[in-house]
Amino acid sequence: MWGGRFSEATDSFVAAFTASVGFDQRFARHDIQGSIAHATMLKECSILEADDVATIIDGLQQVLREIEAGEFNWSIALEDVHMNVESRLTDIVGAVGKKLHTGRSRNDQVATDIRLWLREETDNIIALLVRLQSGLLDLAEQHTDTIMPGFTHLQTAQPVSFGHHVMAWFEMLYRDTERLVDARRRINQMPLGSAALAGTTFPIDRTITAELLGFEGICQNSLDAVSDRDFAIEFTSAASILMMHMSRMSEEIILWMSAQFNFVQIPDRFCTGSSIMPQKKNPDVPELVRGKAARVFGQLMTLLSLMKSQPLAYNKDNQEDKEPLFDCVDTLTGSLLAFADMLPNITPNKENMRAATMKGYATATDLADYLVRNGVAFRDAHEVVGNAVALGIKEGVDLSDLSLAQLQQFSNAIGDDVFDFLTLEGSLAARDHLGGTAPNQVKQAISRGRTRLEVFA
């Protein structure tokens, strides 16, 4: 395909070392899709004859059928998916197949393939995210009154509902979905027609190709179009943030499944046992998702490092962009598939959650707020409650178990109505505002969540 310039054959090791067909054959369907659109545009612009284009398209469709049937013979000697497809096309249709590459370079061809492939994968990932979030809304709806400790510094802080906690997960994932939807807009720009780097001398019409391929825009500068991979980096960045959120969720599930917490159980099908300890039920799926987050972070660093020193325009370095991107997509997709099945099937241990909430003086802030409403300055109220907690620790009881007389020794602003504010249910109900953990607020948040998800349907 380019041997005319050279006086000796490429070394066999170099040919194998520089070939990408071992991995970029994954683009085959998208490569053929792009070629069919390109050929159609060449016909519409009277650059190729209609009969030639019809022959080329028929040949490309046969190549695709062979690939999908597993009958295609991939050749390292042909370097990449593009030349393998073109070579087979020429075998099928003859010399007319050599006309396909008119007005095109592999530089804009591969950039188009990546964008077509990544656009499709992004849509699949968004659909998985929506499925996962829908499952979380269903889970939260079942547990708007299920009380558990809310934590700061992994210490009991204030009572919340399990449903409220699940809705925090939902909000994380919703922002992740927004990021991917936004990244898709920049993925969905067409580089085809930029040729090697400067455009082509043929009178092409890029709008025809863009419309045929479903691109919402056209890359405006040929140098930039063939050489930048920021759209892939942006996707991988959004994927990394998403995996970070899933890693945090995994960490909580792992902790909560431990005997020391015993807050939740997940179905056995998401766990494994031990080869030596028969009692073990190991949370392998969340542990693996937590570990796989590091893998996606690494692929982001790979792509950033790959691009950081490249001058314009295309360089062979960019051959190394595909495997990190493939691995990122595969890792993220697998993690989402696991989570979409696992998370909605979490079963909380309500009794243990409630008992844990009672152990940590979780209503201390409620007592302080009560005092403030009765005219005590907050800093003074803070000290009063600290003294009451110290007494509770000494007596080995919760604040709600102290007598009225015991509480009143710290402040005469405490009346017999104080116990309404020291119950766990009262604490939840008191936080009755947008974003609060009151059961009716969580129910409203769930309803809003269902409406918000419709945007991505």
UniProtKB/Swiss-Prot annotation:
<dbReference type="InterPro" id="IPR020557">
    <property type="entry name" value="Fumarate_lyase_CS"/>
</dbReference>
<dbReference type="InterPro" id="IPR029419">
    <property type="entry name" value="Arg_succ_lyase_C"/>
</dbReference>
<dbReference type="Pfam" id="PF14698">
    <property type="entry name" value="ASL_C2"/>
</dbReference>
<dbReference type="InterPro" id="IPR000362">
    <property type="entry name" value="Fumarate_lyase_fam"/>
</dbReference>
<dbReference type="InterPro" id="IPR024083">
    <property type="entry name" value="Fumarase/histidase_N"/>
</dbReference>
<dbReference type="GO" id="GO:0004056">
    <property type="term" value="F:argininosuccinate lyase activity"/>
</dbReference>
<keyword id="KW-0055">Arginine biosynthesis</keyword>
<keyword id="KW-0028">Amino-acid biosynthesis</keyword>
<dbReference type="GO" id="GO:0042450">
    <property type="term" value="P:arginine biosynthetic process via ornithine"/>
</dbReference>
<dbReference type="Pfam" id="PF00206">
    <property type="entry name" value="Lyase_1"/>
</dbReference>
<protein>
    <recommendedName>
        <fullName>Argininosuccinate lyase</fullName>
        <ecNumber>4.3.2.1</ecNumber>
    </recommendedName>
</protein>
<dbReference type="GO" id="GO:0006526">
    <property type="term" value="P:L-arginine biosynthetic process"/>
</dbReference>
<dbReference type="GO" id="GO:0005829">
    <property type="term" value="C:cytosol"/>
</dbReference>
<dbReference type="InterPro" id="IPR022761">
    <property type="entry name" value="Fumarate_lyase_N"/>
</dbReference>
<keyword id="KW-0963">Cytoplasm</keyword>
<comment type="pathway">
    <text>Amino-acid biosynthesis; L-arginine biosynthesis; L-arginine from L-ornithine and carbamoyl phosphate: step 3/3.</text>
</comment>
<dbReference type="InterPro" id="IPR008948">
    <property type="entry name" value="L-Aspartase-like"/>
</dbReference>
<comment type="similarity">
    <text>Belongs to the lyase 1 family. Argininosuccinate lyase subfamily.</text>
</comment>
<keyword id="KW-0456">Lyase</keyword>
<dbReference type="InterPro" id="IPR009049">
    <property type="entry name" value="Argininosuccinate_lyase"/>
</dbReference>
